[in-house]
């Protein structure tokens, strides 16, 4: 698990890049600034989400200490139900699936719509989808967000582990740039370790290449 730490310089860059969406009223980072090349710079300024391992307990403590209230009791299920409904509404026909697992919501982002082959930079055409995700994450901020990258079995295990980590980091960097608290996030790459389909077919390999985002309630 890794955190991003935003420096004063990074914060200035992000503030200068922020615009207000006229349709939603939400602030987001300018698409122009997040275009080819400059998108990577803003992502780096927002924090690389690299290497700092921390416990779930520590993440929760950081958020509660910053004034974010924890969910409790019967309100948890309703809160996550409402978040699920918003995610399904905003992500309809996007290619991203929404699955409810207990009190958590899981997003599956297939790599073919998120990244070019063997690349870890988010496709510009996927920015709008991530903006929609960020808007829901802003509204339902009493949640923790785990971003995990996965690959198929082609190539070496070391390469796949690194690629999956870089892809997960790219998605998390983009989302934290949309004024989301980095303390909510963890990032991990699991390479080819957790396939959801056979790697014996092209179709199965395509399903295995993905980034999954698990959103769990802050309790």
Tell where the protein language model's regions lie, with residue ranges.
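Stable alpha-helical elements in mature extracytoplasmic
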Residues: 41, 45, 83, 87, ...
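Second-shell loop/turn segments in exported
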Residues: 73-77, 114-122, 157-160
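Amphipathic, membrane-active segments
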Residues: 81-112
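Periplasmic peptidoglycan-binding/anchoring modules of Gram-negative envelope and division proteins
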Residues: 90, 114-149, 176, 206-208, ...
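Periplasmic OmpA-like peptidoglycan-binding domain that tethers envelope proteins to the cell wall
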Residues: 148-218
């Amino acid at each position: 698990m890794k955190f991003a730490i935003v420096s004063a310089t990074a914060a200035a860059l992000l503030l200068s890049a922020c615009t207000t969406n006229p349709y939603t009223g939400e602030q987001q980072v300018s698409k122009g600034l997040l275009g080819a090349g400059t998108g990577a710079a803003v992502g780096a300024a927002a924090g690389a989400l690299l290497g700092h391992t921390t416990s779930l307990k520590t993440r929760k403590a950081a958020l509660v200490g910053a004034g974010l209230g924890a969910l409790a009791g019967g309100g948890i299920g309703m809160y996550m139900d409402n978040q699920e409904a918003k995610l399904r509404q905003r992500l309809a026909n996007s290619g991203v699936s929404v699955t409810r697992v207990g009190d958590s919501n899981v997003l599956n982002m297939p790599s073919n719509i998120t990244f070019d082959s063997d690349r870890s930079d988010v496709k510009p055409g996927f920015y709008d989808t991530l903006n929609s995700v960020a808007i829901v994450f802003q509204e339902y901020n009493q949640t923790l967000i785990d971003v995990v990258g996965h690959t198929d079995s082609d190539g070496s295990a070391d390469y796949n582990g690194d690629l999956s980590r870089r892809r997960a980091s790219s998605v998390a960097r983009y989302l934290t740039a949309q004024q989301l608290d980095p303390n909510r996030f963890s990032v991990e790459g699991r390479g080819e370790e957790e396939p959801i389909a056979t790697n014996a077919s092209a179709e199965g390999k395509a399903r295995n290449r993905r980034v999954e985002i698990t959103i769990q309630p802050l309790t």
